[in-house]
Amino acid sequence: DQMTETGRPSLSDAAGMLLFFLAAVMAVYSLTLCTSTDIWYDELFTMGLAEQPVGRLLALAAEDVHPPLYYLIVKAVTELVHLFVPGLDAVIIAKAISVLPYLGLLGYAAVPVRKRDGWLCAGLFAFCLLSMPQLSNYTTEVRMYGWALFFVTAAFLHVREILISGKRLHWAAFWFYGVCAAYSHYFAAVSAVCLYAALALLLWWKQKKRGG
């Protein structure tokens, strides 16, 4: 982070903080949209699947065009919330679950992106994610797209950390997010495979460069 001689944030940092704040406001606003229980056909399918026993859920998901991880997340979180708030509508819970990955991306913007690239890059990263056209529809949609976006983006950010530091934590996180992406959406699975291939190629190139 850059500071001026007076100890205040630089103009670029201030702009980044403002953009990050606006992104956070949009994410919080998405939570207020969760109170509506109106859902469409695909979301009805999600809710119906999440109400099934795990074995039945997996069997039905095997016949669907999407992998089962998202449905398992919805089922697990919904049942956990119902332990504490039994009367809360499951649709409201499911919509809030869809906001969580965007909050996770804000967390990545605030910590690793900010530490590596400063507030301006972190703010742009967060703002561009949360201000995409029609994103308010996707942030609360009871489908897996937000989670797929989160897993792929997080995996990408850990690829960068692997190339910089090579710490085992980042290897573990990259593996975890890559697997989660593959089990969230098939397009995300393709993206994860591309990240694995890119990492292997970059590590090979890095090793070759060191060797001479």
Descriptions of predicted regions:
Residues 140-144:
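Short acidic/glycine- and proline-prone juxtamembrane loop motifs at membrane-interface regions
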Residues 158-171, 191-212:
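Perimembrane helix-loop-helix junctions
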Residues 38-72, 76-84:
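Extracytosolic helix-loop segments that constitute the early lumenal/periplasmic catalytic or substrate-binding loops
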Residues 12-43:
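Transmembrane signal-anchor helices characteristic of membrane glycosylation enzymes that use polyprenol
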Residues 125, 170-186, 191-192:
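Membrane-interface alpha helices of multi-pass inner-membrane proteins
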Residues 55, 76, 108, 128-131, ...:
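Specific aromatic-rich, kink-prone transmembrane helix
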Residues 68, 72, 83-107:
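Loop-to-helix entry region of an early transmembrane alpha helix in multi-pass inner-membrane enzymes
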Residues 20-24, 96-116, 154:
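Transmembrane-helix motifs of polytopic, lipid-linked glycan transferases
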